[in-house]
């Protein structure tokens, strides 16, 4: 969590677009070195007896070239979700994090909607420009709704598409974890009426 990551825009929400361009769309050499060190330390701490490290970070959608340079055999899971749902959720997350760790007063929800829509578009454009760099067999695309509604089958599809071994031994543990989470109900994401109206207008 340094100023070279997307968390800079959370700490300084009044300058979110500038930090997004600097730290997400144009990652620095220092960030690459820090990411490599962080990944190695995480592996040393969590990777004993395991064969894969899974990183979930939407900012990496814009870092395909960097990730392949650092980890040539990296495999990618691209999650398709309705943009309006993704953006609405991210606006709420940004608002809450700004209250927890922000060093500035957060912008209005209306402004955050506009900035987040722009950032989402730039993120998708960056991925579209670089997806051809991903070698065959190292990318699988799945629908968010499939993951939510049929998690076990969707995860099996990921294992198969990316040729990850060990599904038979992992299946029961994954199924048990899914069963424990069945009682969870996601909190509805509700924006202020003006912000919601603006979001729908921008995506119409």
What are these regions (language model features)?
Residues 1-53:
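PAPS-dependent sulfation machinery
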Residues 6, 59-62, 82-86, 92-93, ...:
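Short, solvent-exposed loop/turn segments at secondary-structure junctions
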Residues 26-29, 43, 91-204:
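PAPS-dependent sulfotransferases, especially Golgi type II membrane carbohydrate sulfotransferases
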Residues 28, 60, 69-72, 79, ...:
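Active-site-proximal structural scaffolding
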Residues 38, 63-66:
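Short, hydrophobic/aromatic alpha-helical segments in well-folded domains
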Residues 46-50, 70-74, 136:
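Short, well-ordered loop/turn elements at secondary-structure boundaries
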Residues 52-55, 141-143:
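Short catalytic-loop micro-motif centered on adjacent basic/acidic residues
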Residues 57, 67-92, 158:
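Conserved phosphate-donor/acceptor-positioning beta-strand/loop module used by diverse small-molecule
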């Amino acid at each position: 969590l340094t100023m070279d990551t997307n968390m800079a825009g959370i700490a300084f929400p009044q300058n979110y677009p500038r930090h997004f361009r600097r730290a997400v769309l144009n990652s620095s050499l220092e960030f690459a070195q820090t990411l490599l060190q962080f990944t190695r330390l995480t592996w040393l701490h969590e990777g004993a007896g395991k064969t894969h490290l899974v990183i979930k970070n939407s900012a990496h959608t814009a870092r395909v070239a960097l990730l392949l340079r650092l980890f040539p055999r990296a495999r990618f899971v691209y999650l398709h979700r309705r943009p309006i749902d993704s953006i609405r959720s991210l606006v709420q997350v940004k608002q809450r994090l700004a209250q927890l760790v922000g060093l500035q007063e957060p912008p209005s929800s209306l402004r955050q909607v506009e900035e987040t829509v722009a950032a989402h578009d730039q993120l998708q454009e960056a991925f579209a420009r670089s997806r051809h760099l991903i070698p065959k067999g190292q990318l699988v695309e799945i629908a968010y709704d499939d993951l939510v509604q049929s998690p076990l089958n969707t995860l099996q599809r990921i294992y198969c598409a990316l040729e990850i071994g060990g599904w038979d031994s992992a299946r029961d543990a994954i199924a048990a974890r899914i069963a424990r989470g069945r009682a969870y109900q996601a909190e509805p994401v509700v924006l202020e009426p003006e912000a919601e109206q603006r979001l729908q207008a921008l995506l119409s």
